Amino acid sequence: MSRWSLHFLGVGSASAIELGSASAVLERDGEPVLMIDCGQEALTAYLARYGAPPRALFLTHTHMDHVAGMERLFVQLYFDPARRGDCRLYLPAALVPWVQHRVADYPGVLAEGGVNYWDAFRVVPHTRGFWHEGLWFDVFEVRHHAPGTAFGIALPGSFVYTGDTRPIPEVLSSIGQGDEPIAHDCGLFGNPSHSGIDDLEREYPVALLARLHLYHYGSTADGDALRVRGYPVMQAGDDLALSPPRQR
């Protein structure tokens, strides 16, 4: 039987560079299956761990701590004929114009000309979810800045990953099989864009709180304070053991 895990490349908020930009990789038997988000530090950590660029990538939203590595990834993919156009980029359909505006629309992506940013990728837009390597991944909208601009991802039976979000009890109650570990955005204090631990304890039932594994916090000290509250707090380099996917 395959061994499944979620490897955390980084767990920090946008200002917590020392914790790495928030990103994780679904692994099967230690090999990467799907990278989630591609901040600058996340791409560096990915290359250090796996020795090659990702072959599959899902983006939760387009804030720069989650997409700043995309220009560098383009260069690495495009100039390797064996990888050019081979990286599957799974994009919620609503994010396609934002990736275009934020990353792909820079004039003259290569000085030599004759190249489109998207030539390096195999783009797979989706709404409710997508198939990858025979697995169905659920995709769901979260609460982060403007509506329709941020999304989470779940592999039924294995994990839920919220991406950046405020509390979403009504969403998490209907995603997955109901017993997966939930990697959840959580700082020591909340704000209009991100969850704080008091927000989660106020809005989530005890059974849901028991499934949380916290990431996207502001400092090592904040992480320690969250642990004192009794929650698992992920660190860069951690592996979260997963149950095998339960597919349709």
Label for each model-derived stretch:
Residues 1-49, 122-170, 238-248:
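Core dinuclear metal-dependent hydrolase active-site scaffold
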Residues 2-4, 85, 113-122, 133-135, ...:
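A short helix-to-beta-strand connector/capping loop
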Residues 40-90, 178-180:
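Active-site metal-binding motif and surrounding structural segment of the metallo-beta-lactamase
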